[in-house]
């Protein structure tokens, strides 16, 4: 199975100067190479903090390109991410941090730290390794975390790509919250074909 990080690496080589993401008002465009460089710096900063396989790092910031770069940086470090909304109550964020054993929350302050780091290569991951954790709403008590593997992400992206984005030139609008599970498909499917 061609895991997402392998597809990403190929696409950065093939389509480095192409736009990977455009903000909602069309004023900010980020290429595959730019997104890859920022995520590589984030990966370096994470590795310096001892982050790697088996870790889950929650990301909490406004919906923008840097959120995606943070997720990619976490994946490159070998860890899994949990996307959190900045609108979550502090108690919910604290519970999720404790539940997933996260050493810290990746936020805007962390991005500032990572901005001067050198680029790091992605760690090798297997299909069984964790890629991202999604937390339930917690409507019946505390939120419950569900860890999804790299194989699960790759299979979902492949299915959605074949159906919704069969051509490289296709684009996709993404408007759901980054903390919503369907968002993983909305983000990673368009990035996989280039």
What are the language-model segments listed below?
Residues 144-173, 177-194:
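Conserved AMP-binding/adenylation subdomain of ANL enzymes
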Residues 1-151, 165:
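Carrier-protein-dependent adenylate-forming modules in NRPS/ANL systems
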